Amino acid sequence: MINFNVGAWRPTTGQARAARLASANDLVTRTLAQHGLTSGSGTASSHGDGSETMRSALSGLMARLQPDGGPATPPADIPAGAAFAEDAFTCAAGTRRYHTYVPASAREGITGLVVMLHGCTQTPEDFAVGTGMNALAEQHRFVVVYPQQSRGDNAQSCWNWFSRGDQMRDRGEPAILAGLTREVIARHAIPADKVFVAGLSAGAAMAVILGGAYPDLFHAVGAHSGLPAGAAKDVTSAFSAMAGREAGSAPRDTPTRTIVFHGDADATVHPSNGAAIVRQALEGGPAQSLQTDAERAAGGRSYRLSTTYDADGAEAVEHWLIEGLGHAWSGGQPAGSYTDPKGPDASAEMVRFFFSPSS
C-alpha cells in the first residue's frame, strides 16, 4: 500500500529546507538528464538557487541540436601546397579560435570564401571531414573558414542562437563572427561579393542570423537542419521552436539568398523550421515570385526541391526536404560525425548555389 500522507507538507527549518531544495534540484537535474538535456551528473547546485541546474539544462538543450553520432574525427590529410591553419580573433564582444583552409589551387586565384559553422559538440576539424568542404574548395579555389565555439561560452560547443545577446548586428557572437570573417577577407584578398556562410543545426541557426544581420557581408546562406532567426529568445521558447511549436521569427526588410536542407525524419529540429527559414529569407522581396517544385532522388533518397526565383530569374531560395533523413548532414562523409552518406550532397549543392553565375 502507498501512504500518500508520507509526503504531506509540514513547516521546516533552514537546514531541512536547504536539504529538500537540494534534493529537488537533484531530481530536476536527473530528470533533464534522462531526456538528454544535461550532462547527467545528477549533482545539484551548491548555491541552492537552481542556477547551475538551469545552466546545465541550457547546455543540454543545445546538445539536442545535434544528431546521434560518434566522437570527433581528426582532420584528413592536407594536399601538398594547401594549408589548414589555426588562428584566433578578438574584438570587444569576445574571442574565438578558427581554422582556415586555403587550397593548393588558390595559387591560380581565390574565387571566394565560405564560413562553416559546426553543430553542437563538433570541432572545426570534424566538421571539415564530415562535410567534405575542403575537397570542394580545392576543386573551386575558394577559402573555407571554420570558427570554433568556446566551451567557456557554451558547455556543448553550440552557437548561442537562442540568446537575445547573440542575435543582432554588432553584438555577441554575430559581432565576433563578422569581425573574424572580415579579417580573413583582408588577409587573403577575397572578392567582397563572394562571401557566404553555412552551418549545421545550431550552426545553421547562427548562419541564418548572420545572413540577416550582415547582408552587406554575407551574400548567401546555407542552412542545414536549422531554425529561423528570432525563433527563440530563451530556453523555454527554444524548446518550442525545436519542436515546431510557436516558433518566432525576426522580421526582415530585404530578402536573403538562402539554400535550406532539412530531413523529414528530423526528430531534433522539426522540419517546419526549414520552411520557416524559407519564408523569412523571402521577406522584403517582391510580393509575387515564381516558384517551382520537383520530386527527385539522389544517393538513395527521394527529396522535394522547391525553388523560388527573383525578378531576374535567378534562384533566390532553394528548399530541399529529404525523405527519411534525420538530423544529419545529407550526403556527408562517414568519417565525420553527424553525417548521413545517403541522399543528395548538401555540400556540393551549397557550393553550386553560392557560386552560381547569377549570385
Over which residues does each language-model region extend?
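A domain-start/cap signature at the N-terminus of enzymes
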Residues: 1-113, 125-126, 131, 198, ...
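Short beta-strand/loop motif that positions the catalytic acidic residue
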Residues: 260-262, 266
